[in-house]
Amino acid sequence: MDNFIQELQRLFPDLEVREGVDVPALVVPADQLLALMTELKEKRGFNFLADLTAVDYPEDERIEMVYHLLSVPGMAEIRVKVNLDRQHPEVPSLTALWPAANVQEREAFDLMGVKFPGHPDLKRILCPDDFVGHPLRKDFRLQTEGGE
C-alpha cells in the first residue's frame, strides 16, 4: 500500500497520511475531498462507502468527517478524514459517487450540523423538522418545557 499512498500524495500534495491501528487515514482539505474520493473510487478500486460519520472536537473548534472505504475486489480498506470549521462545517456531498451517502450525510447534518453542498435532499432525518440544534454536538443542551 506504500506505493499507492505515495502516488496519492503526488496527486494531492496537501494530503496528510496518518498511520492507524487498523488502516491508514488520509487527511485531506474539504475542497479536495471530492477529487480524492473520485480518484479512490474510479481509479483505485475503492468501490464501497462503508460508512461516514462526524466527530465533534469543541476544544479544537473543529468537526472531523470520517469516511471508511472498501475495495471489495482488492480486499483493502482505507479511512479518509476531513477537518471542518466547527462554526461553519461544510464539505461536498458524495451522493453522486455513492448514492448510499444520501442517508448518512442527512444524519450528519441532522445530528452534527454538517452541510453537504450538492446533496439532493439535505434535511433532517431523525429529529423533527422544527428541532433546534444538533444533539450529538458535545455542547448541546436539551431544553425542556419550563427551563432546563
From Swiss-Prot:
Family recorded in the similarity comment: Belongs to the complex I 30 kDa subunit family.
Single GO MF annotation: quinone binding
Entry's localization field: Cell membrane
Enzyme Commission number, as recorded: 7.1.1.-
Pfam families to which the protein is assigned, alphabetical: Complex1_30kDa (PF00329)
Top-level taxon: Bacteria
Gene3D superfamilies, per database record: NADH:ubiquinone oxidoreductase, 30kDa subunit (3.30.460.80)
Entry keyword Translocase: yes
Gene Ontology CC: one annotated term: plasma membrane
Catalytic activity: a quinone + NADH + 5 H(+)(in) = a quinol + NAD(+) + 4 H(+)(out)
Membrane topology annotation: Peripheral membrane protein
Protein name: NADH-quinone oxidoreductase subunit C
Keyword terms of this UniProt record: Cell membrane, Membrane, NAD, Quinone, Translocase, Transport
